[in-house]
């Protein structure tokens, strides 16, 4: 029989029904699934915050039937019986918004929307738009040839010029056209060349170089043509000429003469 001291010092046996401690990873996974289930429930409640009210209006009490829901995360939720109080919803009027008007740089009047403002960020109203000259749309090729601009001047120099993309009207299979605003292209050309006089001088120099290149090509073609003519004449001279005589003529004393029909050479001979 054990004494009282032995009973006090002996370790107590572990209860059989005490649950074992779960690893940290498992507990974290369980917690994530539980949070996911709660979020699904909150989202479902937020989707129907105001149940259908009674036809007579006013405050009503609605009781939802319990329902078993599988959250696909390891938990099955049972909807609790909830009471939703339905009342009249009062919407507060929104704040008064002031329109952001833009001032036209041509006439000085305010406007809300315009073609040039939307497509080219140019503060000009539709009434002041000069589509035939100042605000004319020109192609990228025309901008490069007329104002001596490069691709980097149009697309990479800050700020890059805005453009419109349209189908080529001449051929549907050709590439799309880039249309720039003439006013902005002129300003960019002045930024690149410094002044209108410098731009005109550069255009004259380029025109002179173009004329020189054309003259060189023309002289080269004339030289090749002369060489071809000389070679053909030289070939004709190297071939032997064969006379083609016409009918003979009786002169006198058994003397006869024949004349070449090609070169006019006369051959006189005597028949024995």
UniProtKB/Swiss-Prot annotation:
Q: PTMs? A: Ubiquitinated by HERC2 leading to degradation by the proteasome.
List of residues binding Zn(2+): 104, 107, 125, 128
Q: Which GO terms describe its molecular function?
A: damaged DNA binding; protein domain specific binding; protein homodimerization activity; sequence-specific double-stranded DNA binding; zinc ion binding
**Which segment of this protein is annotated as the motif Nuclear localization signal?**
28-49
Which GO BP annotation is one of this protein's?
A: response to UV
List the induction conditions: Exhibits a circadian pattern with zenith at around 5 pm and nadir at around 5 am in liver but not in testis, this oscillation is dependent on the circadian clock and on HERC2 regulation.
- Give start-end positions of each zinc finger (unnamed): 104-128
Q: Keywords in UniProt for this one?
A: Acetylation, DNA damage, DNA repair, DNA-binding, Isopeptide bond, Metal-binding, Nucleus, Phosphoprotein, Ubl conjugation, Zinc, Zinc-finger
Q: Where is the stretch described as Disordered?
A: 1-22
Report residue spans for region: Interaction with CEP164 and required for UV resistance.
4-96
What's an example GO cellular component term for this entry? nuclear body
- Which InterPro entries does the record associate with it? DNA-bd_dom_put_sf, XPA/RAD14, XPA_C, XPA_CS, XPA_sf, Znf_XPA_CS
The family database entries (Pfam families) matched by this protein are listed as: XPA_C, XPA_N
Q: What does this protein do?
A: Involved in DNA excision repair. Initiates repair by binding to damaged sites with various affinities, depending on the photoproduct and the transcriptional state of the region. Required for UV-induced CHEK1 phosphorylation and the recruitment of CEP164 to cyclobutane pyrimidine dimmers (CPD), sites of DNA damage after UV irradiation.
Other remarks in the entry: Plays an essential role in the repair of cisplatin induced damage by nucleotide excision repair. Cisplatin is one of the most commnly used anticancer drugs.
Tell me what this protein is called: DNA repair protein complementing XP-A cells homolog
